[in-house]
């Protein structure tokens, strides 16, 4: 009832740039959904895809590296496609493409489209090895841009307004008049 896939790449990039692959994957999934379903999903930074404020996709990116650098990066994707029921603890926050659009589409076409868009954006990313050329595209999909969000930081949570991302993919927020970069944690 879903799509569960992993994209494995061996990019020649430095370790600190690996997290941006999650953002590229998220944009590719959004592009594929929009192409097939004619609906505009949004990204809840950095790794969730939402439609009507409900999560329909999660992304987990991991890598293997050694002293010479990155050996490979794997971006795992789980998309709720045909699901119609969810456990009680997530039924108010999770959904599927079928529930949100009322239509069934071919999962193979979704996978093909996602892979196409992934490599298209990866090529753009590799030209600068940062998000500068993809920043406006990503921000156009950012679910909470201009809205107050709660940053769940290891040092404690705090409210802030989401402003966008920087060239490294960090979330930029305004917290009490100070611009902060969020590089990890939950939003």
Model-derived features: where do they sit?
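DPxDG-like acidic metal-binding loop motif
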Residues: 1-12, 21-25
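Conserved active-site carboxylates
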Residues: 48
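Long, positively charged amphipathic alpha-helical accessory segments at protein N-termini or as interdomain linkers
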Residues: 13-15, 23-41, 51-187
